Swiss-Prot record:
This is Ribosome-recycling factor. Belongs to the RRF family. It is found in: Cytoplasm. GO terms for cellular component: cytosol. GO terms for biological process: cytoplasmic translational termination.
Length: 185
């Protein structure tokens, strides 16, 4: 029973860290990455469709993405979707390919992005702590119902705390990597 609670907490904490990593991977660093365009939805015959389903996105060089649209007739719609996104990108057509040059980030913009990333990291830490609180509440309920002893409860809470510390360190490590990546250019 205690092991189930700990395993559940570990799984949920891992998901919190993964969600944080996925979220910050979409923050533009000046270096080309196909994940930058993950949130782009294209109007494809009247329905909003993710760009990934309509084209392949590859890195041409460190500052340029190349989009190869599967259906040439929607090239203009793909360009429009990228231009109207809040990414500040200006795509250009070159035959069947669309090239998306990424402008260099200014120092001020980098500092703003670092603030955003730090805020996201704090959200990640809060999520991990919420999972800890839920696990501790479940343990206290078992103790109250006399299904586990006080010693078992204390040991399990210590294990959950150790797990929490490990996952918060993972969030901090991902934050440090992203900050370094943002300031490297």
């Amino acid at each position: 029973m205690i092991n189930d609670i700990k395993k559940d907490a570990e799984t949920r904490m891992e998901k919190c860290v993964e969600a944080f990593r996925n979220h910050i991977s979409k923050i533009r660093t000046g270096r080309a990455s196909p994940s930058i365009l993950d949130g782009i939805m294209v109007d494809y015959y009247g329905s909003a469709t993710p760009l990934r389903q309509l084209a392949s996105v590859t890195v041409e060089d460190s500052r340029t993405l190349k989009i190869n649209v599967f259906d040439r007739s929607i090239g203009a719609a793909v360009e429009k979707a990228i231009m109207t996104s809040d990414l500040g990108l200006n795509p250009s057509s070159a035959g069947s390919d669309i090239r998306v040059p990424l402008p260099a980030l200014t120092e001020e913009r980098r500092k703003d992005l670092i603030k955003v990333v730090r805020g996201e990291a704090e959200q990640g830490r809060v999520s991990v702590r919420n999972v800890r609180r839920d696990a501790n509440d479940k343990l206290k309920a078992l103790l109250k119902d006399k299904e586990i002893s006080e010693d078992d409860d204390r040991r399990a809470q210590e294990d959950v705390q150790k797990m929490t510390d490990i996952f918060i360190k993972k969030v901090d490590a991902a934050l440090a990597d992203k900050e370094t990546e943002l300031m490297d250019f």
